């Protein structure tokens, strides 16, 4: 999936109020960007890092520029816009790039399900096969090649795992897909040191039939695609 119009480059001054970031452009202009990431963004928002941002044609937006990528001083590329996790997953599903999830004829998004009134990111259907429920999570937390999720305690994420376990218990196919949006990550694990309950639930979910996948995006300032399967350690 290509960025269009092309992204523009700047240098990060600071991120603040969770949703805002100040940057300076190569020609010396200071801009305030919208930051579409409510997480801790550990390692993704260091002052001095290169930022790649998009610009909306919507003239009514208070902040027309959106922070899309971080290029760290070590050279790693990170997609900080969490909306891309679902966009890339949808593109990969539509093109059968994820072999474990191929062979379905219908793809639906944001389907209501479960006792806790959740919405599943994607549902795959085909003939008389069990429906396939897919929950997508964006992974950007990295430590020496190891990717982790979550980067903060997530009650919502815990709820999604409980819902997926219920889906599996009903005989449907339940999948949690970790979309790794950090070029330096080579393997994935749940972040026990941050949210032990989530890590325990993920292990329990696997034992109860929930499938766990981690796919890494190829990232550049021109575009991204989700194609590479990564090893997982629970």
From Swiss-Prot:
Cross-referenced NCBIfam families, in alphabetical order? sfsA
| Coiled-coil regions listed | none
Question: To which species is this protein native?
Answer: Escherichia fergusonii (strain ATCC 35469 / DSM 13698 / CCUG 18766 / IAM 14443 / JCM 21226 / LMG 7866 / NBRC 102419 / NCTC 12128 / CDC 0568-73)
Keyword entries, A-Z: DNA-binding
- PANTHER family per record: SUGAR FERMENTATION STIMULATION PROTEIN A
Q: Name one Pfam family in it.
A: SfsA
Similarity-based family: Belongs to the SfsA family.
Which gene is the coding source of this polypeptide chain? sfsA
Q: Which GO terms describe its molecular function?
A: DNA binding
| Name of the protein in question | Sugar fermentation stimulation protein A
Which InterPro entries does the UniProt record give?
SfsA (IPR005224), SfsA_C (IPR040452), SfsA_N (IPR041465)
Identify the DNA-binding region of this protein by residue numbers.
201-220
Described purpose of this protein according to its UniProt entry? Binds to DNA non-specifically. Could be a regulatory factor involved in maltose metabolism.
Top-rank lineage group of the source organism: Bacteria
């Amino acid at each position: 999936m290509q960025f269009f119009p092309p992204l523009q480059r700047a240098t990060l001054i600071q991120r603040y109020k969770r949703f805002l970031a100040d940057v300076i452009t190569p020609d010396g202009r200071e801009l305030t960007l919208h930051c579409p990431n409510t997480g801790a963004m550990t390692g993704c928002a260091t002052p001095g890092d290169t930022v790649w941002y998009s610009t909306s044609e919507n003239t009514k937006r208070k902040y027309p520029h959106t922070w899309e990528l971080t290029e760290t001083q070590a050279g790693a590329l990170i997609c900080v816009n969490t909306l891309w996790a679902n966009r890339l997953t949808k593109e990969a599903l539509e093109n059968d790039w994820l072999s474990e999830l191929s062979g379905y004829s219908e793809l639906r998004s944001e389907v209501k399900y479960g006792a806790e009134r959740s919405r599943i990111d994607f549902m795959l259907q085909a003939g008389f096969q069990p429906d396939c429920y897919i929950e997508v999570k964006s992974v950007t937390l990295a430590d020496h090649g190891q990717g982790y999720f979550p980067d903060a305690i997530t009650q919502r994420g815990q709820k999604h795992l409980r819902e997926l376990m219920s889906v599996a218990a009903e005989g449907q196919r339940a999948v949690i897909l970790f979309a790794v949006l950090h070029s330096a990550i080579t393997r994935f694990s749940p972040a026990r040191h941050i949210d032990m309950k989530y890590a325990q639930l993920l292990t329990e979910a696997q034992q109860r039939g929930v499938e766990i996948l981690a796919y890494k995006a190829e990232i550049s300032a021109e575009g991204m695609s989700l194609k590479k399967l990564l090893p997982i350690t629970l």
